[in-house]
């Protein structure tokens, strides 16, 4: 390293560095990494000052070498490199003549143009950490900090970089060259790892006692102490590690990096086949509600009481008929199941006191619909291991499905506003700190934008259904319990409203493991004629059960009312997450918050109010075949919420895989847009891992279609 320093740096810089080290009692021949660091730092300080002058009008100008600068004043006073006494004399003189406050530590430069001292930092570590250490040590707003790293990054106080871009680029290029030269001689790793943080009293603390013992116990295998582990992590060079591993692998492994250009990516291949079908646990845009306003009946709040009252508001019941059969099911059983529900609700009404819960009679149509006695008998393995042809039963490969337009319509509908408010967030109490005030202000603005959103209705509906079903599954394991599908909201005038969407009948539910399945039959009201999009309703048997009179601009119109019936299933873990669907509100609020934070850091003040109240500004919402769609901040809030809700409603392994794998391609494309010249290897393998998730799930297929739109417009 010493030889490298003497070859690489100007002899004057080497001499100054040696003098500085001797002044502090350090030996350049022993502490060679420190020797190199001091030379680098001095060279950066001199380059910072080079060619910068102040003319007779007090303007900062750049004079290239060879041009006349005899009458010009140097813009920067160099303090770094002087002996301590002389350096402090210069600093005191500057303070006396300019009135600038005296710094606690010796700075590196003084800027006569901006009238401030400058502390220059050159780091081999993470630039933000080094900057914070410097700021912690100096603790002065008078001294301007400017940090350079060997990777071409820089950071300065208030993002004020003092010099023009070309001067800074010269410094960065020189640092990069030093790094390359060191690396070619095998000196870089040792030099990089030798840097210590800025030592300040506040940071010099030891982990001792119980915490130390816990830290030593919590290490990965093969590490004896926390210090060993820290040393390993600090010295870990991921690229070198990966290259080393690759070199140990077979010769057939080809990891040649290919440049990723605008012409490189191709669209994702979406599967062909019949159109995909609706697979959510309850109806979304097609749901119909029977409701009561300002409920005040006896037992109000008890689901069965509320359901009976809602059923009484409808007078158009008629003899049910099948209008769209289920291809593989015994449709008459679904019809009989609905008739049984109607009859048993009538029985409830005839009783003097309505029961709190209703268990259905175990009729043969219900037993069939709920899969009673259909599960294969479990046999102990020891009893059958001698069977010669023992094998796992064959399972069919999933059938490929194509994207259908209904899922985009569902998403659009979820982003819309309804005429009711679905959110009643509890009061959290008075704010006691400024940050709490900002947080509640953001929460209130966000709540105002999404409380009437249809996606919020889906959240409340999902929470109710999953909670009721999980409770019933645990409390009445053997019963076919009737569970009303209910939600509550407030009208624009503030009146309370109770809504009934239909009913669920729960099957046997001895759920020992999280993934054990409970079957249920859902029966949901709707005005949607299933014959318009029969492919959407593949899994349903649909009955016509009545006529509903609707008020329209041209008078009253009678529309047929349908009942969408299907057998479905869920598990404890799915119900547990369904009960926590309110998390979607938090997730989308955090996404909005990060947008506000980005805006606030640019403007250096909190922009929450302006962000939500500037109605004229539009924001990007998403990609469509037409290009980037834009909308108000409210539309952005509702779109982000709807995406989060659909991720919950359509959760699946296909979605998990697609999200994880497509994110990699997205990051590469974004790097290309940011002119970072990304390189890739095995791009075909990445496409394969994305496309193997595109099978039949409607939400995944829609996301893949959006991704293709993004690729088209991002790479124009």
From Swiss-Prot:
InterPro entries linked to this entry: INFV_PA (IPR037534), PA/PA-X (IPR001009), PA/PA-X_sf (IPR038372)
GO cellular component: host cell cytoplasm; host cell nucleus
GO MF: endonuclease activity; metal ion binding; RNA binding
EC number(s) given by UniProt: 3.1.-.-
GO biological process: cap snatching; DNA-templated transcription; symbiont-mediated suppression of host gene expression; symbiont-mediated suppression of host mRNA transcription via inhibition of RNA polymerase II activity; viral RNA genome replication; viral translational frameshifting
Co-factor: note: Binds 2 manganese ions per subunit.
Motif stretch (Nuclear localization signal 1 (NLS1)): 124-139
Obligatory cofactor(s): Mn(2+)
Binding site residues for Mn(2+) 1: 41, 108, 119-120
Keywords of this entry: Cap snatching, Endonuclease, Eukaryotic host gene expression shutoff by virus, Eukaryotic host transcription shutoff by virus, Host cytoplasm, Host gene expression shutoff by virus, Host nucleus, Host-virus interaction, Hydrolase, Inhibition of host RNA polymerase II by virus, Manganese, Metal-binding, Nuclease, Phosphoprotein
Subcellular location: Host cytoplasm; Host nucleus
Residues holding Mn(2+) 2: 80, 108
Motif (Nuclear localization signal 2 (NLS2)): 184-247
Post-translational modification: Phosphorylated on serines and threonines by host kinases, including human casein kinase II.
Family as reported in the entry's similarity comment: Belongs to the influenza viruses PA family.
Purpose: Plays an essential role in viral RNA transcription and replication by forming the heterotrimeric polymerase complex together with PB1 and PB2 subunits. The complex transcribes viral mRNAs by using a unique mechanism called cap-snatching. It consists in the hijacking and cleavage of host capped pre-mRNAs. These short capped RNAs are then used as primers for viral mRNAs. The PB2 subunit is responsible for the binding of the 5' cap of cellular pre-mRNAs which are subsequently cleaved after 10-13 nucleotides by the PA subunit that carries the endonuclease activity.
UniProt subunit comment: Influenza RNA polymerase is composed of three subunits: PB1, PB2 and PA. Interacts (via C-terminus) with PB1 (via N-terminus).
Name by which UniProt lists this protein: Polymerase acidic protein
Organism (species): Influenza A virus (strain A/Swine/Wisconsin/1/1967 H1N1)
Gene (name only): PA
